[in-house]
Curated annotation (Swiss-Prot):
Protein name, as recorded: 3-dehydroquinate synthase
SUPFAM superfamilies per UniProt: Dehydroquinate synthase-like
Record keywords, A-Z: Amino-acid biosynthesis, Aromatic amino acid biosynthesis, Cobalt, Cytoplasm, Lyase, Metal-binding, NAD, Nucleotide-binding, Zinc
Main location: cytoplasm
Organism: Pasteurella multocida (strain Pm70)
Signal peptide start-end: none
Originating gene: aroB
Record's subcellular location: Cytoplasm
Superkingdom of origin: Bacteria
Short name of one Pfam family: DHQS_C
InterPro entries named among the record's database cross-references: Dehydroquinate_synthase (IPR050071), DHQ_synth_AroB (IPR016037), DHQ_synth_fam (IPR030963), DHQS/DOIS_N (IPR030960), DHQS_C (IPR056179)
Pathway annotation: Metabolic intermediate biosynthesis; chorismate biosynthesis; chorismate from D-erythrose 4-phosphate and phosphoenolpyruvate: step 2/7
Annotated function: Catalyzes the conversion of 3-deoxy-D-arabino-heptulosonate 7-phosphate (DAHP) to dehydroquinate (DHQ).
Length: 362
């Protein structure tokens, strides 16, 4: 088992990474008599709910669960209310612990419930998708979507522990593994050129779910994110760099309707758009852009805009992005491979040109 610590100003919490951790009582910071509400979805429940429940019952915990519908389209206030109702019906107080057992959607909704219920209760993340393990479970971002924008209603609320059992990746569809690799590639592109090069050498084994390389990869991503979050917990500086490709990607998700493309698929195209824009600004070479495009393609990720979306469709969505200040776009771009920065007041015409370069030719 590996352990990465997230060091915050006022406290720290561990990320445990290893095989078989769902059944390891030592990973759960709970004691006999503690009340627990597990939040999960039907897909994950059939694989892992009884395993986690049995582990907690052995510790003497009082365990209940709520099962939410599966998919990004259910990351809503309605789902949040289902959690609140279950907590209230079970007479859960401020001393309860909410456990998110699932992917990014479950983690985000359960985390926001933990932040909101009785003004805050303890929260444990057990991410079961690659994307959640390397990204959304770490750092305390919680949210639900609105019809007009992704993650528009939420809070920064840190878990007390993150438990990453790599065995859960064995039950994932290939498409979910590939979507998670988009966020993995992002870390190398923004902050770690040696890691990007390592990915170029090992991407095929990651697609094939080699357990040793996956554990190495997850630990590296968690360490990069932990370091960034330690410097900037509430995204007032460096943490924004973690959003490479996300402004473009969120536009895709919002325009198509949540759930049509996976988050990682949209981010993959968004990263390439950001790279093309960076090349047009004179930061990257065409070879740099080609390296990123090739790596995304080897991870079986899309590299062109959805064929139902026109370049002009992007900007209205992008202008609702949370990084927009005074009505002006702020985009995460690349100064070089392995070094990102936040660009302010980028010419919208140049942004549109970069989007066109990544648009499918019919």
């Amino acid at each position: 088992m590996l352990c990465v610590n997230v060091e915050l100003k006022e406290r720290r919490y561990p990320i445990y990474i290893g095989s078989g951790l769902l059944s390891d009582e030592k990973c759960y910071p709970l004691k006999s008599g503690d009340k627990v509400m597990i939040v999960t979805n039907p897909t994950i429940a059939q694989y892992y709910l009884s395993q986690v429940t049995d582990t907690l019952v052995k510790k003497g915990c009082l365990v209940e669960h709520v099962v939410l519908s599966d998919g990004e389209q259910y990351k809503t206030l309605d789902s949040l209310n289902l959690i609140f109702t279950a907590l209230l019906q079970g007479n859960h107080g401020r001393d309860t612990t909410i456990i998110a057992l699932g992917g990014g959607v479950i983690g985000d909704v359960a985390g926001y419930a933990a932040a909101s219920y009785q003004r805050g209760v303890r929260f444990i993340q057990i991410p079961t998708t690659l994307l959640a393990q390397v990204d959304s479970s770490v750092g305390g971002k919680t949210a639900v979507n609105h019809a007009l924008g992704k993650n528009m209603i939420g809070a920064f609320y840190q878990p007390c522990t993150v438990i990453i059992d790599t065995l859960t990746l064995n039950s994932l569809p290939k498409r979910e593994i590939n979507a998670g690799l988009a966020e993995v590639i992002k870390y190398g592109a923004i902050l770690d050129l040696p890691f990007f090069t390592w990915l170029e050498q090992n991407i095929d084994s990651l697609v094939a779910r080699d357990p040793d390389n996956l554990q190495t990869c997850i630990a590296r991503c968690c360490q990069i994110k932990a370091d960034v979050v330690a410097r900037d917990e509430t995204e007032k500086g460096d943490r924004a760099l973690l959003n490479l490709g996300h402004t473009f990607g969120h536009a895709i998700e919002t325009h198509l309707g949540y759930g049509h493309w996976l988050h990682g698929e949209a981010v993959a195209v968004g990263m390439l758009m950001a790279a093309v824009l960076s090349e047009k600004l004179g930061n990257l070479t065409k070879t740099d852009v080609a390296r990123l495009e090739r790596l995304l393609a080897r991870a079986n990720l899309p590299t062109v805009s959805p064929d139902t979306m026109q370049p002009e469709d992007y900007l209205p969505h992008m202008l609702r992005d949370k990084k927009v200040l005074a009505g002006k776009l702020r985009l995460v771009l690349l100064a070089s491979l392995g070094q990102a920065y936040v660009a302010t007041d980028t010419d919208p015409a140049l942004v549109l040109d970069a989007i066109r370069c990544c648009t499918q030719v019919n």
